[in-house]
């Protein structure tokens, strides 16, 4: 879910795309719905294919255009399930945004982290699981202290040049790490991250509101928030 999201108003149970607001993702030209559809925990573990498809279809009909996923969700099973659903629903590819994240791909050394090899392997695997030709958004799921940031920036730019991803970003990176990524990109004429995906809710505010303050101002990156309801705690769960 994007920060500052407002509720979608439903009128007479009909499709009401006009009630959904869309925001540019940072300084990019991509417009993302204020509400997004996530698949962490729920897909495979809690929802079967029929239930998941009903949820995705309902969200899409109400104007949600961003569907978020990751290689780590259900050990890739979440992307497999979403890919099956996308194929069945037959939405036009230019009407929705789909993402994946790279870091936790498996237990072996070459299946984890942000090395050039794993980034390329993870992207290709996500494309296959999701049954799409390209990813709109591709996130570094966490920072990797064992891989030079310049290697990660180069790997993401390779994928951009190949047309396998449209934008790349970070998730739960420190302001220092994001700044370094931009410094590397500027030095070697590469593209820096377009977005960051931090946790942000009333119980978790420090990083988003304070640590990232200068990052937002300096680099104008966008955000796609995870756990805006604190894993259900704020709903009274």
Give the location of each predicted region.
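N-terminal binding-site loop/beta-alpha segment at the start of enzyme catalytic domains
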Residues: 2-96, 133, 161
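Conserved, mostly hydrophobic/aromatic
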Residues: 25, 37, 52, 67, ...
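Short, acidic/polar
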Residues: 47-59, 113-130, 178-183
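Active-site mouth loops of central-metabolism enzymes
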Residues: 39-50, 105-120, 141-142, 146-147
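Beta/alpha (TIM)-barrel catalytic core signal, keyed to glycine-rich beta->alpha loops juxtaposed to Asp/Glu
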Residues: 11-12, 143-237
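Active-site gating/metal-coordination segments in enzymes
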Residues: 108-139, 191, 199-203
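Generic structural signal for well-ordered alpha-helices
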Residues: 22, 56, 79, 83-86, ...
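Structural motif corresponding to the early beta-alpha repeats
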Residues: 89-114
